[in-house]
Amino acid sequence: MKTQVGMWIDHREANIVFLSPAGERTRQIKSNVEKQLRRSGDSPSRERYETQMVPVSDQRDRGYMRHLANYYEEVFLAAHGADTVFIFGPGEAKGELRKQFQKRHFSERIVGFEPADKMTPRQVSEKVRNFYRTTPAILLRNGD
C-alpha cells in the first residue's frame, strides 16, 4: 500500500488524512487569515488621477492573497510526498491548492477532486477512508 492522502480544505483550515501501511494519521493546518471586510472609507477615489492611486483595500487584498499563497504552500508541502491525493471542500480553496500541485508538476497525483460542505475532522477521515476503499485500483495508479 502506498501513502494516500485526502484533505478537506477551505480558506481557514485544511484537515489532512494520511493513510499508509503504518496506519492513519491526521494533521490540521490553520491559515490564520480572515478576509477583511471593505470599510465605507475604502472605496476608490473618483479624483482626476485616481488610476495612479492604489486604494487601501487593494493593498489589504494583496496581503491577504500573499498570506493565502503561503497557506497553500504549507498544505502542499504536507501532502506532496503522497502517492495519491484526494482534495475536497467548499469554495475556491481546493482549486487554488490544485494550482499549487499543477505548478509543481504533481497534478497527476490528484485522483479525486470534489465539492464538500463543512465537515468535522472525524467526517473528513471517514470520507477519505471510504474514497480510497471504493475507488477502483486502476484509477489510483500513477504511472506504475
Each model region followed by its residue ranges:
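Terminal alpha-helical anchor/extension segments at protein ends
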Residues: 1-144
